[in-house]
Amino acid sequence: MRVLLIGAKGLLGQALAATFSTEDLVAVDRDVIDITDKVALQKFCHEVRPEIVVNAAAYNAVDEIEKNDEAAKQAFVINAEAVGYLAKASIENKALLIHFSTDYVFDGAKDSPYIEADHPKPISVYGRSKLGGEEAILRLAEHGLKYYIIRTSRLFGKSSGAGKKTFVDIVLEAAAQKSELQFIDDEIASPTFVSDLAMAVKEMLMSRPAFGVYHRTNDGYCSWYELAKTVLNESGAYSINHATPDRKYINLRPIASKDLPRPARRPAYSVLQSTKLAPLRHWREALREYIISNHL
Ligand SMILES: NC(=O)c1ccc[n+]([C@@H]2O[C@H](COP(=O)([O-])OP(=O)(O)OC[C@H]3O[C@@H](n4cnc5c(N)ncnc54)[C@H](OP(=O)(O)O)[C@@H]3O)[C@@H](O)[C@H]2O)c1
């Protein structure tokens, strides 16, 4: 299977590159091809002639995009317009396009998990830019584009080089330096291990379900506070809110999102339910594996 992976140096991109390394893989990032350059992208895709195009490129700086007009413009170019270019190049090469989207396309007002058919209603500029990417694909689906739009949430995993740190690593670093930590307790979603997501993508390529929108996250859900607490417990190095010998004491407090003002609004509840495919393993099990193999 000839696979063109775009955004290969990002957090998810690195996990996808590892998972697809046994395939005929061309893994690139912005230094090789900038997806916002329509002509260069089209030429590059014609040269590579992929059967599968996996787009893990995105502009994800949620707060920067909200407060800075230039960043917002960039977000729409990368997350929406360029996705249209990729979709067009995929049709021209008869390739299947796999694209990632986010729980932030929903407003969070629902009190049960969002299913694929729920109507998106983003409450941030980032969310609107990602919805723009979904719409660009759906427009070309009417012209024969083969596609999977995969919505996911709260990615964690190992990221080296230019890849960014995720919440799990940020919590462990903060706990090593401080003894008082506080995290938001009223934003609920599903943490997702990038290696599990990458494997789930590979499985979709084997089983080839119908083209469309899919929800792929680890099973279960939690707040940021509960995730932080689980991370600290799993690391085995900290005792939380009560002193224990041989472990560093951490005073861990839940806070409300209104007490941590940030430029962009986040959905209060954005659990994604998969009605089309079997759920992935529980996030606690995936987190344990990640911490054991990277932090112990
Ligand atoms: N992270 C999460 O928690 C999360 C949650 C839900 C959904 N998602 C979705 O999952 C996907 C992967 O996210 P991620 O967290 O892995 O992203 P990431 O770590 O920010 O990686 C994105 C990659 O895309 C590259 N890129 C950006 N603009 C590009 C361009 N114009 N041309 C080519 N490459 C470009 C970036 O390169 P530079 O470093 O040079 O910019 C970076 O290597 C995205 O679609 C995202 O919306 C992520």
Predicted regions and their residues:
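C-terminal amphipathic/interface module of NAD(P)-dependent oxidoreductases
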Residues: 265-296
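SDR active-site strand-loop-helix element
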Residues: 6, 28, 56-57, 97-102, ...
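Adenosine-cofactor binding site in Rossmann-like domains, unifying the SAM/SAH pocket
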Residues: 21-43
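NAD(P)-dependent short-chain dehydrogenase/reductase
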Residues: 138-189, 196-199
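Mid/C-terminal beta-alpha module of Rossmann-like enzyme folds, strongest
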Residues: 200, 207-263, 291
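NAD(P)H-binding glycine-rich loop region in Rossmannoid oxidoreductase-like domains
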Residues: 38-78, 91
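N-terminal Rossmann NAD(P)H-binding glycine-rich loop of SDR-like oxidoreductase domains
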Residues: 3-19
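Catalytic helix-loop patch of NAD(P)-dependent Rossmann-fold dehydrogenases
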Residues: 70-77, 81-85, 105-150, 154-156
